[in-house]
Amino acid sequence: MPKNMSESLKRTPLYHTHKKIGAKLIEFGGWEMPVQYSNIIEEHLTVRSKVGIFDLSHMGEIVISGQGALKLVQKLITNDAAGKLVDGRILYSPMCNPAGGIIDDLLVYRLAEDRYMLVVNASNIKRDFEWICAHNDDNAEIEDRSDRTVLIALQGQNSVQTLQTLSDVDVTAIQYYWFQEGLITDIPVIISRTGYAGEVGFELYTDARYGADLWDSLYKSTIAEGGLPVGLGARDTLRLEAGLPLHGNDIDQTTTPLESRLSWAVSLKKGDFIGREALIKQKKTRNHKSFNWFPNAGSEYCPFTLSNLPRRRMYQQSYERWALANVRS
C-alpha cells in the first residue's frame, strides 16, 4: 500500500497489535485493516473447526437515547423494534430510503427502554449518522460512539470455552441475538451472541481505552484453543459460504428488502417508517427482481441459525482464489 494512501486511512486502536503479529493490511471502507495474518484458507478453516478472533472496530456504533428514542428507531428501520425488543435483545433490520432502497443493514441493541445502539457498516458511518440526525423530529439524543468503541469478535465452535475462561458471565446462557453486560479480565464489555460467519460466536464491545488489553487476553485464549487471528479476507469467504449479504456489494440503495430476500425483516403492519409506502406498492405489484440469499429464512429476529445455514463451498473456493490473487498482487 502506498505510504501516502496509508497515512490518509483511519486505523483502529489495535493497528499496532496487528502489525506486531504480522498482519497484511489493506484499505477497506476508508480504514487500514488486516486482510489476513497467515493465509485466508487456513483462517477460514480454523473458524469452521476451532475458533478465530477478529478486529471489527471499523464498524460503527450510534447510540440513540431519550424520550423520543424508540419513535425515531421505529421510523428509521423496517423491522419492529417496539414489538420485538426487550432489554438485552438484538434485532437485525434494513434501513431504507423513501424509495425502499437499502441505505444500510444494521443491528439494533436495546440497552434500556429509552436507549438503543445501532451497529452500522464501516463505510456508511458518516452517511448513516447524518441520515439519522436529519430525521430526528422527536428530540432524541444521538451520539456517534464509533471512534470510542472497540469491537472484537470470537467465532467458531470453540468460542464458548475461549471466552468463558476469561468472563464473569455464564456465556453459555446467552441466547442467539441476545447480549449481556459483564467483565472480561476485569474489563467492562457488552457480550453479544451474534456473528457474521455462520458459526457459534460472540461480538464484544468495549471502550477504546481497554481495546488493546481486551484483545491481548482474548488472543492468548484463542491461541490456547487452537485458534488464529482472522482478517477481512476470511471473514468475507465465511459470510459467503453462510449466504450472508454484504451492503455495498450484494445489497445497496438500488435494491429493496423484498428483492433481497429480507422481507422477514420488514414489518409493514407496525406503522409508518421510511420506505413503507414504496415497499407496500412493490409487494402488491410483485414487480421486482429477486436474489436467493436465504432459502430457509423464517425467524422473525434473524434466520441465520446453525441448522439452516447453507454450505456454499463453490462460492467459498471461487472467492478464495480471487482473494488470494488480489492479496498477492
Per-segment meaning from a language model:
Residues M1-S93, G101-I103, G233:
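Acidic, proline/glycine-enriched N-terminal capping motif
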Residues G52-T78, I90, R145-Q164, R286-N296:
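Short glycine-/aliphatic-rich beta-strand segments at the starts of folded cytosolic domains
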Residues L85-L91, I125, T172-Q180, P303-T305:
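Glycine-centered loop/turn motifs
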Residues T255, S260-S329:
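Glycine-rich, small/acidic residue-mixed loop/short-helix segments
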Residues G83-H135:
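Well-ordered mid-protein domain cores that form the structural environment of catalytic cofactors
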Residues T46-S57, I102-R115, I142-R145, T185-G201:
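Residues forming anionic-ligand binding surfaces in small-molecule and nucleic-acid pockets
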Residues L9-Y15, I26, E32, N136, ...:
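Glycine-rich, acidic
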